[in-house]
Amino acid sequence: MFQYVKTLQYPINIKKKDLRMAHLIVTQYGGANGELGAALRYLNQRFTMPDDKGKALLTDIGTEELGHVEMICTMLYQLTKGATIQELKDVGLDTFYAEHGNDIFPTNAAGVPFTSGYFASVGDPIANLSEDMAAEEKARATYENLINLTNDPDIIGPLLFLRQREIIHFNRFKELYKEYKKKGYQ
């Protein structure tokens, strides 16, 4: 069902190591408003959508979110590439290194590991779409916060792209929500 394309949705070429930003951006991988949770949320909710249109939308967006996971992980790798132990210690990433070495692992910015408790799936298309719209808005706000924390255009560019995709996803969910409300789904 899935087809892997070996290019990112937006080119990422971060030239400067920035461990502080990596420490913050990891939240969009494994945090409550991050891309991993979004992908799993939508790919699970799709099964109980009442029609093929809803199933297709959640599948499309859930699959795109997996691409966003790849983008965030690429950013994390490029932001930390070549970091010394002392540099990791200086920004508080030594505790992360102690458990994961140089691997990328889904946590929030405080180091709390990803949990499926970050998202809900209740089998009700209206409730699920409401959850999905809220999730997209929270992700958008998080991207805006991250953008405000850097001046590096190599970081800002991908973050702006991801922010814009959150807005588009919100609008697509909103359209389906309104359609389902008109059809009388509860």
Tell me what each language-model feature is.
Residues 1-186:
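Non-heme di-metal
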